[in-house]
Design a protein with these regions (language model features):
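Active-site-proximal "nucleotidyltransferase
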Residues: 200-206, 210-212
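N-terminal pre-Walker A segment at the start of P-loop NTPase domains
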Residues: 210-239
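Structured core elements
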Residues: 53, 132-134, 199-201, 231-235, ...
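An acidic- and aromatic-residue-enriched active-site/binding cleft used to recognize and process polar
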Residues: 203-205, 239, 250
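Conserved small/polar residues in nucleotide/adenosyl-binding loops
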Residues: 252-258
Length: 260
């Protein structure tokens, strides 16, 4: 592993050279409280952006163990961090100038679903973090503009990392809400079968979406209320008692489109 000063010196050395000189930056660099890894360098400024990752030791990130020891809670925390990091990157994306995709900073943008993603991973034993994202290495035409990349790696990115990947910089209540909600959801999934159910819809849910291409709930929609004959309840670890409609196998069917 090399130091951040070695990366800075390398960038100064290749400045104004032809774009393939950026290939020399591949490798890992110690930035003190995190490691920057340049995993893949794009072939030219108009190609798919370079692949970069940030590695933060659990001892530095300092997330409490109860946020990552259980898989469902860990995935929820990773989802939360990915969204936070994405917002930070969006704030500084294209502040570094150049041709093509120069200055782009982006991470995969999750929908409303909380899923396991390679873009953000946390070790279950120590809480080590890995964030994977894209950077458009700056150029003037097809000539290296290392001064702009230096801004990204030494000014913009450190701010994004410090504001989104360290527990002390985050809203503690929001992080725990995300983890607690995920654990409650997993509790329901784990206890459906013992009640002879395949799905559950909570009372007060908003089921209609605002459009066929949107995941957002419809405004002013009538909240769902379970029919008395299908009501079931669960006592969740964090939210307490919740009531709604339990769906049994006999109520599950597929609706196929009619072919004229």
């Amino acid at each position: 592993m090399q130091s951040q000063n070695e990366l800075r010196n390398l960038l100064q050395r290749i400045d104004h050279k032809s774009y393939p000189a950026y290939k020399d930056t591949r490798g890992s660099y110690d930035f003190g409280n995190y490691v920057l890894s340049i995993d893949h360098v794009q072939g030219d400024p108009f190609a798919a952006p370079s692949k970069v990752s940030v590695h933060v030791r659990g001892g530095a990130a300092k997330f409490p163990a109860d946020l990552y020891r259980m898989k469902c809670r860990r995935l929820a925390v990773c989802d939360y961090l990915l969204r936070q990091f994405g917002r930070e990157l969006e704030r500084v994306s294209f502040k570094a100038k150049g041709s093509g995709k120069s200055g782009l900073l982006a991470v995969s943008r999750p929908g409303q679903e909380v899923l396991e993603r390679t873009a953000c991973q946390m070790d279950e034993a120590k809480g080590d973090l890995v964030l994977r994202f894209e950077v458009g290495f700056p150029a003037n035409g097809r000539t290296v503009n290392a001064r702009e990349l230096e801004k990204i790696f030494f000014t913009f990115l450190p701010e994004c990392v410090l504001h989104s990947l360290f527990y002390k910089a985050l809203d503690e209540k929001a992080v725990y809400r995300a983890a607690d909600l995920a654990e409650d959801q997993q509790y329901i999934r784990d206890h459906l079968k013992e009640q002879g159910l395949v799905a559950f819809v909570a009372d007060a849910s908003i089921l209609p979406r605002e459009s066929g291409v949107s995941g957002r709930p419809m405004k002013d929609a009538v909240k769902f209320t379970a029919p008395e004959s299908m009501k079931v309840s669960f006592v969740l670890p964090h939210a307490g008692k919740i009531q709604g409609m339990g769906i049994t196998v006999s109520y599950t069917h597929l609706t196929l489109p009619t072919i004229a």
